């Protein structure tokens, strides 16, 4: 949901054309997150300011438009921007916007500027909750707004505080100015700011919205971390001016040590990571982004910012400052990590869509989730990220699983096996509802958070809620370095690989497997459950090959969509036991990708109202794979066929009990252990949703109104 990308080159000659191309490529890698408009800002040319004695400044070129990145790319071509100018130090920023404040219109697109000259330029993800009060205050100070967005308030706050400082005879550095602005913001943000007052500099900061910095150098960095500079370590500790002040009139009121007009505050130290062997400046490129996918083509060396971090880049250095004071136990460094991601993983290859590619990657992603974690010969599960916490989790009073969307369905799908193997009560919560109810959480609870991105806003807020109450927290995520993976006590990385399509497919099956492995690891030492334990592990061993068998149904499913489902307006999915979660997940896929109304129904509730919808015209998909509830599912199918319904039945291969003269058709899948059957049953539904969308001419990877990473509430 929205995407930020910034590019900084220092002592690396780049033409303006190359810089623009880097920004556009970065935005293209962010498209999958969902957006409705895009824009970039780069340096223009030296311009004289007649209102300031013809003082020269570097103006900025801001180009933005509604629609796709390819529309922005064409607009840049149409505007015939001079691409030949060479820069050895330059900051360019770019953004894809998903509308929250203000409609998708050009004036609401990012980047936003502080004033007509563009003294400060900002791109921002998140929601500023006090923007109405800020806007009212800034209007009272004479600022003129061009958009309806909350982000424009941030840009104007930068100019407002800059002018106050200059009026007081102080020239603050960009980091200190950023702190003053952040002091006034409420809500969530990930933002970048550049200014012609600070050429070649950029500040990036985050609170509740992801931001990382990629580092590319020819020489090896001296250390693989960057020191965090806390307030007590810094030479200048400004007393933050409040927006309700009438305006500071002296440096003392602003809390600064006075410096000569026009002279920047002294910078007395250099980051250890960027010291060169010969003490000469090191050529370096920085890539600031909200997503690793946009950085991996340039570098695999990345630093993930924490909430309240300020990344200040200038003179080829990256400095990390804190917008808040140091608390006990807080880390004093930010590690520079190596991304475990390859460029080909975020390319479509021979497939038409990312979703299709990711559906067919599931044999590999399922295997990768288990690789190195299950000893199939001795039937032992070892999850390194949980190993030291298992004894604590086994003693907990209850397990609370908290997630959103598809991740919520993976929790529902595995709740029963958790309860069976651990004999610990398990509840499954939607993160937003959990927060709305302010559900009681205790110190002896274990709260399990599941998220593909690890940045889902509702889940992160629920995580913070549980941490405040002293609960043990576990993260099940697909993104190393994400907020959730850093804030939880322990967890499991599902190793599904990058998932670009908005509709989650391989992440669902990998989450499902990871949760089953979690349940197995909790019962590793149980003698009474040894037989069940071994049965499930042997079943997991066969899952990748069985998924390959299910994928062979694609042509049959494609024909089924063409002949029976394309023109339908609604669809019911019936499931019971382990397959109720599969029905819900299938219904969600069909809704979000094909725009067809679909509903997952618990088969046991059929006679409590749902039967009123059944007739010969309503398409129904029923799950009738073999488990302990099979007779009850067959009873539900009989109730449907008795009312002229002709369901599509997903059953096990060679199951002769289902009469073909009563049902519309059958989709046969291999038989596996009851608690794993949902891994195979969900794949026909993924294919149905995909082919329905393709047949309707829908952009499968970018369904309307949806975003991959939901980073706002």
From Swiss-Prot:
InterPro entries: GATase_2_dom (IPR017932), GFAT_N (IPR047084), GlmS/AgaS_SIS (IPR035466), GlmS/FrlB_SIS (IPR035490), Ntn_hydrolases_N (IPR029055), SIS_dom (IPR001347), SIS_dom_sf (IPR046348)
Keyword Cell wall biogenesis/degradation in record: no
Pathway given in the UniProt record: Nucleotide-sugar biosynthesis; UDP-N-acetyl-alpha-D-glucosamine biosynthesis; alpha-D-glucosamine 6-phosphate from D-fructose 6-phosphate: step 1/1
Domain SIS: 389-528, 561-703
Catalytic activity from the UniProt record: D-fructose 6-phosphate + L-glutamine = D-glucosamine 6-phosphate + L-glutamate
Keyword Electron transport: no
Assembly, per entry: Homotetramer.
Protein name, UniProt field: Glutamine--fructose-6-phosphate aminotransferase [isomerizing]
Organism of provenance: Candida albicans (strain SC5314 / ATCC MYA-2876)
């Amino acid at each position: 949901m929205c995407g930020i990308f910034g590019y900084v080159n220092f002592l690396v000659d780049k033409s303006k054309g190359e810089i623009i191309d880097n920004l556009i490529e970065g935005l293209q890698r962010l498209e999958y997150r969902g957006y409705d408009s895009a824009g970039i800002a780069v340096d223009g040319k030296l311009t004289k300011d007649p209102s300031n004695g013809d003082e020269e400044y570097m103006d900025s070129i801001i180009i933005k438009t509604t629609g796709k990145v390819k529309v922005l790319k064409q607009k840049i071509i149409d505007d015939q921007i001079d691409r030949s100018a060479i820069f050895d130090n330059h900051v360019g920023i770019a953004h894809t916007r998903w509308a929250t404040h203000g409609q998708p219109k050009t004036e609401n697109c990012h980047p936003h500027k502080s004033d007509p000259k563009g003294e400060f330029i900002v791109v921002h993800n998140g929601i500023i909750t006090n923007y109405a009060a800020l806007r009212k205050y800034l209007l009272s100070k004479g600022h003129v707004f061009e958009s309806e967005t909350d982000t424009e308030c941030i840009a104007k706050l930068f100019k407002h505080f800059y002018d106050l400082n200059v009026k007081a005879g102080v020239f603050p550095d960009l980091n200190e100015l950023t702190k003053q602005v952040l002091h006034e913001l409420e809500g969530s943000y990930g933002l970048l700011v550049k200014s012609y007052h600070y050429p070649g500099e950029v500040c990036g900061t985050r609170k509740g919205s992801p931001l990382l910095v990629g580092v590319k150098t020819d020489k090896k960095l001296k250390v693989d971390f960057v020191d965090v500079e806390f307030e007590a370590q810094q030479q200048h500790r400004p007393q933050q001016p409040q927006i309700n002040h009438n305006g500071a009139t002296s440096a003392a009121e602003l809390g600064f040590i006075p410096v000569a007009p026009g002279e920047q505050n002294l910078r007395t130290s250099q980051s250890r990571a960027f010291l060169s062997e010969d003490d000469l400046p090191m050529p370096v490129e920085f890539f600031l982004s909200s997503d690793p996918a946009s950085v991996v083509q340039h570098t695999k060396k990345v630093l993930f910012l924490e909430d309240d971090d300020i990344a200040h880049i200038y003179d080829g250095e990256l400095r990390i400052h804190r917008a808040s004071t140091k608390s006990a136990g807080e880390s004093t460094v930010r590690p520079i990590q190596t991304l475990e991601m390859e460029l080909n993983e975020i390319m479509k290859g021979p497939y038409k869509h990312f979703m299709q590619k990711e559906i067919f990657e599931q044999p590999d992603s399922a295997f990768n989730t288990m690789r190195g974690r299950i000893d199939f010969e001795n039937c032992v599960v070892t999850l390194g990220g949980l190993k030291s916490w298992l004894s604590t989790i086994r003693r907990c009073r209850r397990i609370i699983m908290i997630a959103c969307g598809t991740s919520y369905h993976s929790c529902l799908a595995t709740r029963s096996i958790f309860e069976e193997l651990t004999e610990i009560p398990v509840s499954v919560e939607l993160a937003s509802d959990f927060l709305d109810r302010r559900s009681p959480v205790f110190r002896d609870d274990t709260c399990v958070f599941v998220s593909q991105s690890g940045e889902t806003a509702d889940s992160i807020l629920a995580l913070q809620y549980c941490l405040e109450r002293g609960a043990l927290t576990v993260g099940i995520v697909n993104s190393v370095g994400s907020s959730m993976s850093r804030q939880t006590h322990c967890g499991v990385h599902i190793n599904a690989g990058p998932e670009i399509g908005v509709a989650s497919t391989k992440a669902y099956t990998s989450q499902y497997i990871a949760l089953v492995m979690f349940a197995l690891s909790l019962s590793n030492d149980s003698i009474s459950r040894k037989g069940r334990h071994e049965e499930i592990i042997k079943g997991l061993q066969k899952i990748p090959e069985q998924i390959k068998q299910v994928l062979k149904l694609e042509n049959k499913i494609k024909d089924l969509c063409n002949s029976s489902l394309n023109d339908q307006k609604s669809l019911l999915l019936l499931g019971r036991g382990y397959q109720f979660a599969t029905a819900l997940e299938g219904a969600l896929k069909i809704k979000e990708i094909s725009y067809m109304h679909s509903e997952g129904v618990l088969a046991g509730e059929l006679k409590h109202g749902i039967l009123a919808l059944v007739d010969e015209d309503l398409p129904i998909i029923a799950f009738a794979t073999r488990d302990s509830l099979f007779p009850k599912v067959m009873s539900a199918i009989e109730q449907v066929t008795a009312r002229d319904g002709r369901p599509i039945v997903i059953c096990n291969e060679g199951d002769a009990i289902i009469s073909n003269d009563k049902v519309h058709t059958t989709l046969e899948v291999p038989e596996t252990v009851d608690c794993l059957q949902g891994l195979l049953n969900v794949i026909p539904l993924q294919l149905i949703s995909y082919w329905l969308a393709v047949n309707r001419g829908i952009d499968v990877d970018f369904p309307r109104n949806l975003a991959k990473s939901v980073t706002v509430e």
